[in-house]
């Protein structure tokens, strides 16, 4: 039970933790239909339909390292959502792109955000304010390319 005046209720990290955990739980309920994890979902949504990008660029977009992305991309490839191809100029460089099935699934996956939003007791304006504030917070405080 959430206690508004508790020590934790005043801690930014705790509020982010609870929000993230509960939002991901809601997404997970919808993603089961597609046999996707939340991480798989964000990876698919991060790749534009006709785009090829390498693991490093994809990792920067979703704040994941290659050690996490590689096994996930293998699973997504087995499900025929993505294809991994070696770059001709540099065989060490893997290019990731969506398959036709991966492109087709993006529209129903995008609808999940609307379904999840409708489960929350906030207005569109409040949601927009939260998104803008979090975008600002992330851009000012986190740069994935700085990670080693």
Swiss-Prot record:
DNA-binding region coordinates: 55-78
Record's subcellular location: Cytoplasm
Domain of life: Bacteria
A molecular function GO annotation: DNA binding
Induction or repression: Transcriptionally activated by CvfA.
Xref: SMART domains: HTH_MARR
Primary localization: cytoplasm
Gene3D superfamilies the UniProt entry points to: Winged helix-like DNA-binding domain superfamily/Winged helix DNA-binding domain
Classification via InterPro entries: HTH_MarR-typ, Transc_reg_Sar_Rot_HTH, WH-like_DNA-bd_sf, WH_DNA-bd_sf
Positions of the HTH marR-type domain: 9-139
Any one GO cellular component localisation term in the record: cytoplasm
Keywords: Activator, Cytoplasm, DNA-binding, Transcription, Transcription regulation, Virulence
Pfam families hit by this protein: Staph_reg_Sar_Rot
Role according to the record: Activates transcription of virulence factors alpha- and beta hemolysin genes (hla and hlb). Also, activates RNAIII expression, a central regulator transcribed from the agr locus.
Record protein name field: HTH-type transcriptional regulator SarZ
Organism: Staphylococcus aureus (strain bovine RF122 / ET3-1)
